[in-house]
Amino acid sequence: KQEVTQIPAALSVPEGENLVLNCSFTDSAIYNLQWFRQDPGKGLTSLLLIQSSQREQTSGRLNASLDKSSGRSTLYIAASQPGDSATYLCAVRSYNQFYFGTGTSLTVIP
C-alpha cells in the first residue's frame, strides 16, 4: 500500500528565506506526483504536477523535484513571502488512486 509522509509538519520562517518541503512515498510505482496549497477554509490549489517520467517542474518561485527510485519529492520555495503562508500538500497518484500526505503548515513572518 502506498503511504505518503511529509516533513516537517509545521514550519515558521522569516520573510525572504528559501524553503524546502519534503514528501516521501513508499511505493515507486506512481503515475504522477502533485503539490497543492490549501488556504484556511478553502479548497486545494494545484501548484506543480510532475509526471513519473520527469525529474522536476518549475513555476515562478516554486520548483518541485521528483526522485522516483528513492521515493522522494521536494518542493523549493524561493524568497518566501507572507502570502506563501498556507498548508502544502503532496499527493501521489498510484493504482488509479490519489494518496495524500498530511501536509506542511507554513507560516512566513514579515
Regions found by a protein language model. Give the residues of each.
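Extracellular domains of the immunoglobulin superfamily
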Residues: K1-P110
